[in-house]
Amino acid sequence: MKVKAPGRINIIGEHTDYNDGYVLPFAVNRYVFLSIEGSDRFIFHSENVNETVEMEKIEKLNKWTDYISGVIASFEKRGYRVSPVKISVSSNLPMGAGLSSSAALEVATAYAISEYFSFNVPKLELVKIAREAEVEFVGVRCGIMDQFTSAFGKKDHAIFLDTMTLEYEYVPLRLEGYEINLVDSNVKHELSSSEYNKRRQECEEVLKTLGKKSFREVTKEDLERLSGTLRKRAQHVLEENERVLKSVQALKEGDFETLGKLLFSSHESLRDLYEVSCEETDFIVDYLRGKEGILGARMVGGGFGGGVIVLSKKGAFGKIKEELVESYKKHFGIDLTFHEIESSDGVQKI
């Protein structure tokens, strides 16, 4: 049996998903492909890494297999019996560019196991199983957005998701005359070892200081009670949530000019208040600002490298691509990679 699960790009709402905030992602037309069959032991094969790993029982190896093993462990924790299987994966999702290749692998695994063993697990439960694999097994304290989008994606739509209640709404993504590109800085970050978990701790510290249970209870007035780093982190989360709401409205009205401006201000906030951008992604965003037909850009993903999402009028980005490549190479000695991004449906059998 074969399945595919898409990666995702988040239009706006960065570092809000683990703070009970709003996000606006969509599933992209790049996938993890996975096949599953019975076996006498667990065999995991990755075409991309060109490696096969065998194990008698599920164990943590601190490598790519942990995403698969973690999902199986989550099923078993819930009382499902997963007998040994051979799982083969391949992907056309770029790693580390902010498109959530890990979540796509987890969702593909969860969906394949549920279907193969006829567990008939509801989609939302599969999302929770996939996320639990990353948080508890892999050890990255991610929010739920990535797995949710890979499972619930819908072509030609973004998902306006409230990560606190998991209520969601499909918002039409009509890009006629516009395009979305991803620029990969090719500066790689591994979330586990980066500042990501530190930002989570800082946000928990904010809540502790204010005596609140959730960021949804935090108001602009509360910022006065904070200072220094904690104030900056809280201000980003509050304002980024507002930007998501404005972006949903802009998308519904087909107002891409406003959406673009919101992307630029999101990047500034991620750079100055949340402090998760880096020299390379800042350079890309600054370079694009003010160029003809470029409506907006911001870093995407956890930060410290990765990708930049670019919203532009159709064809405008292509005209300045070469200059950007040369300029970036001159500054950093690194080549850029580009991906034109289209929306996609969520996880499915193939």
Swiss-Prot record:
Disulfide bonds: none annotated. Pfam families: GalKase_gal_bdg, GHMP_kinases_C, GHMP_kinases_N. Mg(2+) binds at S102, E134. Gene3D superfamilies: 3.30.230.10, GHMP kinase, C-terminal domain. GO terms for biological process: galactose metabolic process. It is found in: Cytoplasm. One of its GO terms (cellular component) is cytosol. The record marks R8 as: Transition state stabilizer. PROSITE patterns: GALACTOKINASE, GHMP_KINASES_ATP. Pathway: Carbohydrate metabolism; galactose metabolism. InterPro entries: Galactokinase, Galactokinase_bac, Galactokinase_CS, GalKase_N, GHMP_kinase_C_dom, GHMP_kinase_C_sf, GHMP_kinase_N_dom, GHMP_knse_ATP-bd_CS. The active site is at D146. Its EC number is 2.7.1.6. Substrate binds at E14, H15, T16, D17, Y196. It comes from the Bacteria. ATP binds at S46, G96, A97, G98, L99, S100, S101, S102. One of its GO terms (molecular function) is magnesium ion binding. Keywords: ATP-binding, Carbohydrate metabolism, Cytoplasm, Galactose metabolism, Kinase, Magnesium, Metal-binding, Nucleotide-binding, Transferase. It catalyses: alpha-D-galactose + ATP = alpha-D-galactose 1-phosphate + ADP + H(+). Belongs to the GHMP kinase family. GalK subfamily. NCBIfam families: gal_kin, PRK03817.1. HAMAP family: Galactokinase. Catalyzes the transfer of the gamma-phosphate of ATP to D-galactose to form alpha-D-galactose-1-phosphate (Gal-1-P). This is Galactokinase. The lineage of its organism: Bacteria, Thermotogati, Thermotogota, Thermotogae, Thermotogales. The gene is galK.
